[in-house]
């Protein structure tokens, strides 16, 4: 961080202790205290009040990239994540939060904007059934505590970049590489592991994070991207190439703020996803790959789809 940016952040922290902006007269969190630092940071993830539901939405485009050919715009997407946080307190570890959520992302026809039921694969010529993202749950694996097992401070709130009172957060990547539930037991030898990289950038008012009376940072905008292999329902059968997701979105105030195409589809076909799981939800997380595996297994068990041949 440059010295000018450091001074800017320190100046904003000092200014936040004074009556200014929409937080006139509001108490300010002391982020040198790990409990209060956690309160400031958790506002972006969900809300600090138990039972308060948070809703994030995004929209964007999915492109293909295959060596030797022009990138194609395959789909538009509309997505949302609905979540809440459980709040915990411990004599040694201090304050803690754990988020629980469900998420939906729809694949749309890039020409008409309509939700796709089937898709004509331009490389194989096959018409395939579209499986939209409907992951339930997408939870934090453990409680995020303000202190470690020995009571030492763990949580911090130190934004890297603040410009004109706005925190810009991003620049890193989630580099995902783990066993693919659709592959076999020999992935360490033959390959086939799930391999992707995800990027998330967020911007929000520093004042909202430091306002002790605010339970959440409502004015947050996001940009999410992913580079990955083909989606399993596309039936690409190992063809060379990758997919690039590029989206932008924001935190919404209410369910009614979702675009109609997304809201209507969830209400009609994914009503469970209108609310987050309970805070004590201990189910394993789902991904597109685990959901698709279950769909394939169910269809094969019912005879709707044939078993894969031995050759």
Spans of model-derived segments:
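Bacterial N-terminal signal peptides that target proteins for export
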Residues: 1-10
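A eukaryote-biased signal for long
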Residues: 167-311
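N-terminal segment immediately downstream of the Sec signal-peptide cleavage site
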Residues: 26-107, 245-256, 260-264, 272-311
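C-terminal cell-surface anchoring/sorting signal
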Residues: 2, 19-22
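Bacterial N-terminal signal peptides
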Residues: 10-20
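Short, flexible coil/linker elements and helix-boundary hinge sites characteristic
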Residues: 19, 42, 113, 125, ...
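Predominantly extracellular/secreted and cell-surface proteins with exposed
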Residues: 68-209
């Amino acid at each position: 961080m440059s010295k000018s940016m450091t001074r800017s952040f320190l100046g904003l922290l000092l200014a936040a202790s004074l009556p200014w902006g929409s937080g006139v007269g509001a108490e300010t969190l002391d982020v040198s205290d790990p409990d209060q630092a956690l309160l400031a940071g958790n506002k972006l993830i969900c809300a600090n009040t138990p039972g308060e539901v948070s809703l994030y939405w995004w929209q964007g485009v999915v492109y293909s990239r295959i060596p030797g050919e022009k990138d194609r715009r395959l789909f538009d997407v509309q997505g949302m994540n609905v979540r809440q946080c459980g709040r915990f307190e411990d004599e040694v570890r201090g304050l803690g939060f754990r988020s629980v959520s469900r998420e939906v992302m729809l694949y749309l026809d890039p020409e008409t904007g309509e939700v796709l039921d089937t898709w004509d694969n331009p490389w194989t010529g096959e018409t395939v059934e579209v499986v939209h993202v409907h992951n339930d749950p997408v939870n934090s694996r453990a409680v995020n505590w303000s202190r470690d097992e020995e009571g030492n401070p763990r949580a911090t709130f130190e934004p890297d970049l603040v410009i004109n009172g706005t925190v810009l957060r991003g620049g890193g990547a989630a580099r995902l590489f783990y066993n693919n539930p659709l592959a076999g037991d020999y992935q360490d030898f033959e390959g086939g592991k799930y391999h992707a990289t995800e990027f998330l950038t967020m911007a929000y008012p520093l004042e909202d994070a430091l306002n002790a009376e605010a339970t959440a940072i409502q004015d947050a905008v996001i940009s999410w991207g992913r580079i990955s292999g083909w989606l399993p329902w596309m039936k690409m059968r190992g063809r060379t190439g990758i997919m690039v997701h590029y989206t932008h979105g924001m935190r919404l105030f209410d369910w009614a703020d979702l675009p109609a195409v997304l809201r209507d589809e969830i209400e009609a076909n994914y009503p469970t996803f209108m609310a987050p799981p309970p805070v004590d939800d201990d189910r394993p997380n789902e991904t597109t790959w685990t959901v698709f595996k279950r769909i394939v297994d169910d269809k094969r068990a019912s005879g709707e789809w044939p078993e894969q041949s031995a050759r």
